[in-house]
Amino acid sequence: MSDMRLIVAGAGGRMGRTLIHALHEADGAALVGALEAPGSELLGQDSGLLAGLGPNGIPVSADLWSLSKDADGIIDFTVPAATIANVAIAAERGIVHVIGTTGLSASDNAVIKSVTSRAIVVQSGNMSLGVNLLAALVKQVAKSLDEDFDIEILEMHHRAKIDAPSGTAYLLGQAAADGRGVPLEEKSVRSRDGFTGARGRGDIGFATLRGGTVTGEHSVIFAGPYERIELTHRAEDRMIFARGAVKAACWARGRKPGLYSMADVLGLGSQS
């Protein structure tokens, strides 16, 4: 089979540049388009030079419709508004859409789900093998321990991250809620300030830290009577997310239309 031809959305961002590197090194996949927002000062620049590689002859463009004419898929780590705009075009073109964008609202996710009857979408708050294995472990531990064990999720990222809690924190929270058989939206506690009263039994708490250049750290804490279990993942390089996203795109090629997760890609079974 020929290389999968991929577009990188948000080509000038941290993840976009890392994805261009990943595709430069990848077997079975190749970069054919680099997408940025209309009006970006990066438009027209060589995407290889932008990523710190040599020139690759692929200029940054704002026209996804034209780029997608000769592509098999798009990898999208952007912002919610851009991702939702890209969803419609990717579905119309019939190309795979890998979504790593975080901070999506319930209505955004509804839009994404609405196209999956005719489009192939892989969506995850985290594309790394380690985090998705962690989510599977969290689900199992939450299922095994009753509400005598309180669940808290602690995450830390670099100072420039604009959404909180992280998409990975939500993924882990969902895994914990699934293990307990409860709706996350009813049990999640995302802020504590002032006189909050005692912790609610069965709550799933989230705590957020921001600072420095931290790529990503997540811990899920099960705090029980006189003992505590902590499951932790530390990301040391964004390349783990980029390689996971490329793997997801290649895996999705030729699949039936639908909404898939990294658990599907990695053969871990459904986490929902």
UniProtKB/Swiss-Prot annotation:
One of its GO terms (biological process) is lysine biosynthetic process via diaminopimelate. Its EC number is 1.17.1.8. Keywords: Amino-acid biosynthesis, Cytoplasm, Diaminopimelate biosynthesis, Lysine biosynthesis, NAD, NADP, Oxidoreductase. It catalyses: (S)-2,3,4,5-tetrahydrodipicolinate + NAD(+) + H2O = (2S,4S)-4-hydroxy-2,3,4,5-tetrahydrodipicolinate + NADH + H(+); (S)-2,3,4,5-tetrahydrodipicolinate + NADP(+) + H2O = (2S,4S)-4-hydroxy-2,3,4,5-tetrahydrodipicolinate + NADPH + H(+). GO terms for molecular function: 4-hydroxy-tetrahydrodipicolinate reductase; NAD binding; NADP binding; oxidoreductase activity, acting on CH or CH2 groups, NAD or NADP as acceptor. The keyword Lyase does not apply. The keyword Amino-acid biosynthesis applies. (S)-2,3,4,5-tetrahydrodipicolinate binds at residues 158, 167-168. Pathway: Amino-acid biosynthesis; L-lysine biosynthesis via DAP pathway; (S)-tetrahydrodipicolinate from L-aspartate: step 4/4. It is found in: Cytoplasm. Catalyzes the conversion of 4-hydroxy-tetrahydrodipicolinate (HTPA) to tetrahydrodipicolinate. This is 4-hydroxy-tetrahydrodipicolinate reductase. It comes from Afipia carboxidovorans (strain ATCC 49405 / DSM 1227 / KCTC 32145 / OM5).
